[in-house]
A protein has these predicted regions:
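Cell wall/extracellular polymer interaction/catalysis modules
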Residues: 122-299, 317-320, 325-399
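Cell-envelope/ECM-targeting effectors and their regulatory/trafficking segments
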Residues: 1-148
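Conserved beta-strand and immediately adjacent loop positions that scaffold enzyme active sites
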Residues: 56, 102, 204-205, 308
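Glycine-centered small-residue hotspots that permit tight backbone geometry or close packing
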Residues: 5, 38, 46-47, 237-240, ...
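Short beta-strand-centered segments at strand-helix junctions
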Residues: 306-320
Length: 400
């Protein structure tokens, strides 16, 4: 079994402390171990005779799952993500259930599928696309982003003017600095029903533009709860720089990989009357820079876990072929079932893991993406795009 922490003969890092210092964060309990999937699970290095890890890495690289990976004979976080991405591809694109739930561990079944691909010279169908030669839908989203930028450069809202004038360090960009380079990875959050008071639902949509293809997820961009006496934080409209990091890094039982503000934090405004609605009065409030607004997992999607973070639910997603992919059988509802079997199916973070694995595989050495938060009304800026696009996507995501 090849899994996180497995290394080929002679490929264990000479200085494990230095190795983990580069990939873990300062708030985490210092450990010379890999963070596993289940609650409180930490994995030691484990040796495997021969060069099986390197063989798997070479295969994944050739077939489109490990394009920026290093062939080093060590199954680290990037290799494990690429292995899980291959498993999900076989399950969801080839529709071959024999591989089982994607768990990032290569045993007999995964290795047999790897041999099948090698024998038949199969590769991921997304290899036919690049940022320069992209899917038509990818191009449509990029055109929409460009039109949104042009619109707000000439007609900035009061909030966008405040963001541009913000004088301190922040990872939130003023409208004149919004950058939609198609070679970069872009995640678009579409905020819906933000002015509606009361219980916040998982009714928002996320669109991942990556290497010329499009994936769609659902969750929430709005806080559903908050313990802050000043009111819940709402991430502001516009583009923000994010990087890979760790969510809940001070809790070694629950810490897991997530996207965090690139350096100093992102700009928020407070829900001053604490009604969990984003109103004109709130928008007129003071900007704050906040380093804790992460993009993270939200369970299967039963309730809103956000306290201001951007939250991706695990129940399902729409893949690059525009197929709705159901992950509910292996999408954990809570931390307590992560990494365990429920009805004999290994539980992961489901669709959220797909997003993480895609960004891990295709982010290069930067391990980062650009996050653009727009309003549903912004879809109307491009009349040919479809103002009800987010409604349609959300309806598909929440279909029982």
């Amino acid at each position: 079994m090849i899994k996180l922490g497995t290394y080929d003969t002679g490929c264990k890092p000479a200085n494990p402390k230095e190795y983990f210092a580069k990939i873990h964060e300062g708030g985490m309990t210092p450990k010379k171990q890999f963070r596993g999937e289940s609650k409180g699970e930490w994995l030691d290095f484990s040796s495997s005779p021969g060069n099986q890890v390197a063989t798997i890495q070479n295969f994944l690289k050739e077939r489109g799952f490990f394009p920026f990976g290093k062939i080093d004979g060590l199954c680290g976080y990037r290799t494990s993500s690429s292995m899980r991405l291959f498993q999900e591809y076989v399950r969801s694109v080839e529709r071959d259930a024999s591989i089982g739930a994607p768990d990032g561990m290569f045993g007999r079944q995964s290795l047999s599928h790897m041999k099948r691909w090698h024998k038949k010279a199969i590769e991921a169908d997304w290899n036919q696309f690049t940022s320069a030669d992209a899917q038509p839908e990818f191009k449509k989203w990029m055109v929409l982003l460009s039109k949104i930028r042009s619109h707000y450069r000439t007609q900035p809202t009061a909030l966008l003017r405040k963001i541009s004038a913000f004088g301190d360090a922040t990872d939130s960009l003023g409208v004149n600095n919004w950058d939609f380079d198609p070679q970069r990875i872009h995640l678009i959050g579409i905020r819906r029903n933000e002015a509606k008071p009361g219980k916040r639902e998982n009714d928002d949509v996320f669109v991942l533009l990556i290497n010329g293809v499009v994936f769609k997820f659902y969750g929430t961009t709005d806080p559903g709860k908050s313990t802050n006496s000043s009111g819940a934080p709402f991430l502001v409209h516009g583009q923000h720089r994010y990087r890979f990091g760790w969510h809940k890094q001070f809790d070694d039982q629950k810490v897991y990989r997530a996207l965090k503000p690139r350096s100093s934090g992102v700009l928020i405004i407070r829900d001053s009357n604490r009604d969990f609605a984003l109103t004109p009065d709130d928008l007129a409030g003071r900007l704050e820079n906040n380093a804790s607004i992460n993009i993270h997992w939200g369970g299967r999607g039963v309730s809103n876990w956000s306290q201001g973070c951007q939250v991706i639910c695990g129940r399902g997603y729409i893949n690059h072929n525009n197929d709705m992919i159901d992950c509910s059988s292996f999408a954990a509802t809570t931390y307590s079932t992560l990494g365990k079997k429920v009805d004999n199916v290994f539980q992961t973070k489901g669709a959220y893991s797909v997003l993480v694995d895609l960004v891990t595989a295709f982010s290069g050495s930067e391990y980062a993406l650009d996050y653009m938060l727009i309003y549903e009304g912004d879809l109307k800026i491009d009349p040919g795009f479809g103002a009800n696009m987010a409604v349609k996507i959300n309806a598909v995501m929440n279909k029982e």
